[in-house]
Amino acid sequence: QKFLTEYKNHNFYDFQGSTWAPTVVHKEIWKNVNGFSEEFFPGSGSDPDFNMKLWKRGIRIFKGINNFKVYHFGSVVLRDKINKFNKGNKFGSISGKMFLLKWGISIKFFKKFYLLSDIKYEKPLEDPKFSFLFLYKLFLCKVHYLYLKVFYSKLISKSK
């Protein structure tokens, strides 16, 4: 009820790099990338994975629209299952590891350097610009990737 009375007061701007549902895509694009991947636990890593599949197919418009308001319940429906799924995982979420193993970069890296998340939307995205910070963070992703390949063999078989 509170949301319905106050949502008009929450104005920002159309922003770049949306990685959250709801997502609107043409059904042919959805079919082309096979929608959300089932290997990701619902509500945990499936949105960035879907966006990476779109990126790999050449999609470059990832836009959060200010006038489109959605109340997100914060995984209320699946919270217990998600907490159980990630329980005892002090080195990050399992779905974060699965994303890294599948794509070779972390979700955080993808959002920061590819989707440019949370900045004002101005135009379709371009390929990331190489900088020292980009290369350094990419190197850290690759080190973490190798670590997971060596020490998380069960997780690797799960992500395939």
Label each PLM-derived region with a short phrase:
Residues 41, 63-86, 98:
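Active-site donor/metal-binding and catalytic loop motifs
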Residues 88-91, 101, 109-160:
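Non-catalytic, C-terminal membrane-associated alpha-helical segments of glycosyltransferases
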Residues 1-6, 40:
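Conserved donor NDP-sugar-binding/catalytic core segment of glycosyltransferases
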Residues 17-34, 40-68:
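A short, conserved alpha-helix in the catalytic core of glycosyltransferases
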Residues 4-28, 32, 84-87:
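A recurrent flexible, glycine/aromatic-enriched loop bordering the glycosyltransferase active site
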Residues 51-52, 96-100:
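Non-transmembrane alpha-helical segments in soluble domains
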Residues 46, 87-91, 95:
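Soluble or luminal CAZymes and related metallo-dependent hydrolases
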